[in-house]
Amino acid sequence: MAAASEDLAEPEPYPAREVLAAFATACSGIEEIPVAQASVQAAGWEHYSPAADSAIARIVASGEELMAKEDPTVQILDGGIWRKSVAGRELFTVISGVELEGVVSHGCRVYDLSAPAALPLEELRDWAVRDPAERPNGIPGGSKFVWNPGLKPGHMEMEISFVPQGTVLPEPLAGIPLSGIVFTASSVEFTDL
């Protein structure tokens, strides 16, 4: 009888505040990759070298391949992959960037690849203390919220997206094992000005 009552138990609520705080701490220094790396390390994230066939490694490799196809002159700036358990959630932070003619862009992404649902808009609004723009992500059941400026002044954009578990992504993303919640902070510097 105990097993049956355990099966009926409500799932634990998603630890949104803790995960959002981890994202803010990890990604607040994204203007400079070394600063972002120091921030994640100081916050207790572990530098991580995933197996090549792991979901996070495939996501990163696919992103780099897509950028190189879009512009063969792009220089990929690698800031590393980091891992941390936050309130029982396994999170990955990916710090990266690209350098193109006249533009340097840095990005910090925190992935919760097993998140079962999107964060409620009200919770995101309360946390960010401002309204996001809601943008379609073209994925049934998915969501995408964007803030401009981003996580803090000086950041270009902040985005929080959700992809339902088991989703097959459309081209050109087909084959990328992306699911769950992705928290993104980005900065852009125009070097030709």
Positions of predicted regions on the chain:
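Long, charged/polar, surface-exposed segments that mediate recognition or autoinhibition
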Residues: T73-L151
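Short glycine-rich, low-complexity/disordered patches
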Residues: S28-I56, E134-L151
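Generic hydrophobic, helix-prone segments enriched in Leu/Val/Ile
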Residues: F23, T93, E159-I160
